[in-house]
A protein has these predicted regions:
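Substrate-positioning beta->alpha
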Residues: 162-169, 182-205, 211-214
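N-terminal Rossmann NAD(P)H-binding glycine-rich loop of SDR-like oxidoreductase domains
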Residues: 4-23
């Protein structure tokens, strides 16, 4: 049994982690908003946690972050929460004698890269990705034989009642029973089911690992595959029409961001993703749970 301190216990992934492992590990969480978990401490600011709050724990998992929020256009705010606060919490954990600090990061540190491997340069293109990369680098610099930093960079997560922006849009489109333009989509994108992600995080704590990790589902999917899986889960028939090349070129020119998300590739090297700490993820399931409408 591990003694685990979770920061950001009111986040979705943290809640999934707590529910799965509350009976097998000793978990205490600090949250900004109450969730009803018995061993929860609600605070106004995580940065104000005293060093003593970290004492006696084997590992700290930091889920606290500002993620992609279009209304926030201030790099300083992202840096303050995702970078400086994360490093401050890690410093306090190290001072208190905690052996491992697990930082939830993101593949957004690679910007628009379509293939991610050990040699892919880190070139974030958003405030979110930039702030996370700054934290990742400083936390790794803090890592030593007494204090291990583990950086987890997952792709888009889904499942457990959660469907992020673009996936939720696809679910709603499928629910409308209209033809969709993905019949010729042969792209490859990595995703991770929330169950796979929390199991990977727990395995990282259990094995006391350090370094940078890229957990994913077992195989990548094309947008066409995703639509077919959504249709199967919802029990509906969806017509996927092939898209003329002139249409795709127009979308790529006018909305390159949309083209990348729907027809572009985001694939993590399989050896990098799957063999790091012996995890054995399953394939895409439960994508549409509680996400229709």
């Amino acid at each position: 049994m591990k003694k685990i301190l979770i920061i950001g216990g009111d986040s979705f992934i943290a809640g999934q982690f707590i529910r799965k492992y509350v009976s097998t590990d000793s978990i205490t969480c600090y949250s900004r908003r109450p969730t009803g978990y018995e061993k929860e401490i609600v605070v106004k600011a995580f940065r104000d946690m005293p060093v003593e709050a970290f004492s006696g724990f084997d590992a700290v998992i930091n889920f606290a972050a500002i993620v992609h929020r279009p209304e926030v256009k201030d790099q300083e705010l992202y840096d303050d929460v995702n970078y400086r606060m994360a490093c401050l919490l890690a410093q306090k954990a190290k001072q208190a004698g905690v052996g491992q600090f697990v930082q939830m990061s993101t593949i957004a540190v690679f910007g628009s890269a379509s293939r991610i491997s050990e040699t892919t340069p880190e070139r974030p293109q958003t405030y979110y990705g930039s702030s996370k990369l700054k934290a990742d680098k400083e936390l790794m610099a803090m890592s030593d034989w007494e204090f291990k930093a583990a950086i987890i960079r997952p792709p888009m997560a889904y499942g457990g009642g959660m469907a992020p922006g673009n996936m939720l849009r696809l679910i709603r489109l499928v629910n409308k029973h209209i033809p969709l333009p993905f019949g010729s989509a042969r792209n490859s994108r990595d995703f991770i089911n929330v169950k796979n992600l929390v199991e990977f995080i727990h395995l990282a704590v259990e094995k006391e690992v350090e370094g940078v990790f890229y957990p994913t589902d077992k195989v990548p999917y094309s947008t066409r595959n995703v639509v077919e899986e959504i249709s199967r889960q919802l029990g509906v028939h969806t017509v996927n029409l092939p898209s003329p090349s002139i249409f795709l070129k127009l979308v790529e020119k006018v909305r390159p961001d949309l083209y990348q998300k729907l027809w572009g590739d985001v694939v993590i090297d399989r050896q990098l993703a799957l063999s790091a700490i012996g995890s054995d993820p399953f394939n895409m399931t439960m994508m549409t749970a509680n996400a229709g409408g």
